Amino acid sequence: MTQVFQGRNFLAEKDFTREEFEYLIDFAAHLKDLKKRGVPHRYLEGKNIALLFEKTSTRTRAAFTTAAIDLGAHPEYLGANDIQLGKKESTEDTAKVLGRMFDGIEFRGFSQRMVEELGEFAGVPVWNGLTDEWHPTQMLADYLTVKENFGKLEGITLVYCGDGRNNVANSLLVAGTLMGVNVHIFSPKELFPDEEIVKLAEGFAKESGAHILVTDNADEAVKGADVLYTDVWVSMGEEDKFKERVELLQPYQVNMDLVKKANNENLIFLHCLPAFHDTNTVYGKDVADKYGVSEMEVTDEVFRSKYARHFDQAENRMHTIKAVMAATLGNLFIPKV
């Protein structure tokens, strides 16, 4: 299996087979175990990794940096003020230059087309750290966390609550149905997923036996839920939409009433973070002052409850990103897992 990843880009979930995606999850679990036991796993010894960031980041930057160092590579951060993608230099030219200097390239930004161009012209593996359309490294962490809690993925029901047309919702739908996970999107009709994304997921669901539900009805959405998942109500670049999103998405908040509707004591709660569950941030205070809402997509009660697994999920970003880099770029002594 290892050989099928060598030299490949990691740009979107739809580019991989079920077996490949599940292998990366299992490989990440193996690397996590090595990390916990203090066993070196320097599959990228002597490699140089470029980390390109148009968008700000805490978890993605920290995960790629620590993962690269653990693997023996040198990570070099290039922020929005350091790169000229499409401004003073075309993406194609930038890709060709960076590909001569680095062994692998991570990109976190707005345009999916841009990361695809990097992948087309760099000549080295390119990894999507997030775009407006897809968030594939997050999915590996999410579904690793699910598997750690339930021992399997096939047949699990995951309910995403909130903005059903953002990158996380897109990726949850496609990655989940690819692996046999039932995915429910609980969202207002105005924010239902794009039809093309749903059709793509339906194709995967037909192969895997997964079930898809897109609804604005809470009772329908959480019926049979094993996982409740939410994300911020306003994505990066949409800050002018705060007022309308708060009004529109308040009924889709993950709170204890919604948890109780699921009627599953083994249920877990996931969030890709950051979460606006209180007013202990400048952002949270500002929203509370302007709109009278002290808790947004998830209540503080749920966020701190026994159901919460989001900090495990955040840690798993590092282990899964490590798996992607090692599999696509690593020296070929990766064990079978």
Curated annotation (Swiss-Prot):
PROSITE patterns: CARBAMOYLTRANSFERASE (PS00097). It catalyses: carbamoyl phosphate + L-ornithine = L-citrulline + phosphate + H(+). GO terms for biological process: arginine biosynthetic process via ornithine; arginine catabolic process to ornithine; citrulline biosynthetic process. Pathway: Amino-acid degradation; L-arginine degradation via ADI pathway; carbamoyl phosphate from L-arginine: step 2/2. Carbamoyl phosphate binds at S57, T58, R59, T60, Q84, R108, H135, P136, T137, Q138, C272, L273, R317. One of its GO terms (cellular component) is cytoplasm. InterPro entries: Asp/Orn_carbamoyltranf_P-bd, Asp/Orn_carbamoylTrfase, Asp/Orn_carbamoylTrfase_sf, Asp_carbamoyltransf_Asp/Orn-bd, Orn/put_carbamltrans, OTCase_ArgI. One of its GO terms (molecular function) is ornithine carbamoyltransferase activity. Reversibly catalyzes the transfer of the carbamoyl group from carbamoyl phosphate (CP) to the N(epsilon) atom of ornithine (ORN) to produce L-citrulline. NCBIfam families: orni_carb_tr, PRK00779.1. Belongs to the aspartate/ornithine carbamoyltransferase superfamily. OTCase family. This is Ornithine carbamoyltransferase.
